[in-house]
């Protein structure tokens, strides 16, 4: 019953996605992954049994397309919880004397509630209330689709504008969403061979300067430290591709020195 309720939930995403003309790239139920081209893989990555589906829509090239895709994305995101609730209450009502129907209904309602509050409902809300998150979300979707031609220009331009609005006097006060958005901006700009665009992003320069002085070891949040490390690696790659090997080595050396000092301080305090 639990596995069936997970499958119905994910199929709900696909059904509502199809209604608004979004395509499914792959569907995962536990270790089973079914791709759009019919390829099936068995891969166990997690310690728990869950489900996921990856949907994408038309390329966003202007404001009007962006507005439409926000609505379509929200519909497909909420399609899973809605389907879980409908099937859950339906089975509880229609199969009152059936044990399987009872458990399926309970699991479906629990899955619908959990995903509505955390995994599906929250992104659907943020897409409309947080422009930085919305551009970050659609840029990551465009990057991970199986489409041969990926169009980043509009999303990169708009995301850059949102990143310029971010103000913080320390990396600790910068949200993980903002750091993730910055990483995707830098990565996609690198794909477009537009590395120089990063130089005008104030938050990027501020982050690099703080890391050079404090190192990465000072940041306790593992997720944040992981994203910061990825941002630094991208900067080193950009410097190397620009033929500025000396600056890349200097950046690496300062990071190493700062981390060594931080490690020494931690050992001394202990």
Q: At which residue positions do the language-model features occur?
A:
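Short, flexible coil/linker elements and helix-boundary hinge sites characteristic
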Residues: 95-98, 130, 161, 190, ...
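Hydrophobic transmembrane alpha-helical segments that form the core helix bundle
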Residues: 61-148
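Amphipathic alpha-helical repeat scaffolds of TPR domains
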Residues: 134-145, 172-193, 220-241, 262-270
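Small-residue-rich helix-interface/hinge motifs
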Residues: 2-62
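Acidic, Ser/Thr-rich low-complexity segments on the non-lumenal side of membrane proteins
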Residues: 140-177
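Structured, soluble extracytoplasmic/luminal domains of envelope-associated proteins
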Residues: 72-75, 79-80, 84, 182-204
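Alpha-helical repeat scaffolds
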Residues: 153-167, 194-216, 243-258
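Solvent-exposed, well-ordered amphipathic alpha-helical segments
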Residues: 1, 7, 92-102, 229, ...
């Amino acid at each position: 019953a639990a596995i069936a309720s997970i499958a119905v939930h994910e199929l709900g995403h696909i059904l509502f996605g199809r209604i608004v003309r979004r395509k499914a790239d792959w569907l995962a139920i536990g270790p089973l992954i079914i791709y759009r081209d019919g390829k099936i893989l068995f891969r166990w990555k997690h310690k728990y049994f869950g489900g996921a589906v990856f949907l994408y829509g038309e390329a966003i090239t202007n404001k009007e397309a962006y507005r439409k895709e926000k609505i379509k994305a929200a519909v497909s995101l909420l399609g899973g919880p809605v389907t879980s609730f409908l099937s859950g209450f339906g089975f509880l009502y229609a199969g009152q004397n059936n044990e399987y129907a009872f458990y399926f209904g309970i699991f479906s309602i629990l899955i619908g509630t959990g995903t509505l509050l955390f995994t599906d409902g929250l992104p659907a809300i943020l897409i409309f209330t947080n422009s930085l998150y919305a551009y970050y979300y659609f840029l990551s979707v465009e990057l991970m689709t199986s489409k041969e031609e990926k169009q980043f220009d509009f999303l990169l331009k708009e995301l850059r504008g949102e990143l310029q609005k971010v103000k913080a006097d320390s990396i600790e006060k910068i949200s993980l969403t903002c750091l993730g958005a910055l990483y995707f901006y830098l990565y996609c700009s690198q794909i477009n061979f537009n590395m120089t665009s990063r130089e005008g992003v104030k938050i990027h320069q501020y982050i690099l300067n703080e890391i050079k002085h404090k190192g990465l070891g000072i940041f306790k949040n593992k997720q944040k430290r992981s994203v910061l490390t990825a941002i630094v690696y991208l900067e080193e790659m950009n410097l190397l591709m620009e033929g500025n090997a000396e600056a890349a080595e200097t950046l690496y050396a300062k990071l190493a020195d700062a981390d060594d000092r931080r490690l020494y301080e931690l050992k001394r305090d202990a």
